[in-house]
Amino acid sequence: VQELNVAGAEIARKAADCCERTIIVAGSIGPTGEIIEPLGELTKAEATSAFNDQAIALKEGGVDVAWIESMYSEEEIECAITASKEAGLPILLSSTFDSHGKSMMGHEPKQLVELAERYSPEIIGYGANCGIGASELIGSILCLAKSRNNQAMHLVAKANCGIPEYTDGEIIYNGTAEIMASYACYARKLGATIIGGCCGTKQEHIKAMADALEANDMDCPIELDEIIKSLGEMTKGNMLMIEKYLNLGNSSKVSPVNPRRKRRR
């Protein structure tokens, strides 16, 4: 764990330091794959110790921030938070939400917001990552944006590049650069200040997203029908969750949360 995390962080740090502008390097801390007791056999002490080993190694390798991501259990998230705090790293936190707009353990977006804001200022931002495509993740961002109280904290969007498909012995994500560019603009319109791509995202997708964010003002209210047409269908479960959080009723418009922020070069 120590050797791999130090090496990975050092590679990222070296690449970032070659850029002309300041680049923040985040070290990813993902789930253990086990369930915390009493539902599972992993103790909180064991989980915290494992996360602490990783967080210390990431810091040694040169990361600026710990990114706790893809987690679905509040208990495991809290263990990772404790470990990252002990390592002296500021924290970003993102969860993965399913087709019903909840985590695997049944937690809603507002519960992630409550957890993250409780640990502020150590946690500097929170949001959603991975999931089942850009459209569904935007649904989660809608709910998170509606739930937030501390506007100073970053809102994070990190969608998969489409849906994985098994083709000719390979896992291929079906998202296009155009879809990811549109997703990035919708995410910013809803208040996201940290926007990226998760599984399947390649260099050409990141470039398309960056170019779109630089060029697109997106000043008009967002139409849900427009999001679906641009990014793909949302599940019924996610639509119901959005209606619950935003009280849309018969309206399909979502007003902007934040003014546009110019991307720094």
Task: List PLM regions with ranges.
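Domain-level signal for soluble alpha/beta catalytic cores
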Residues: 1-265
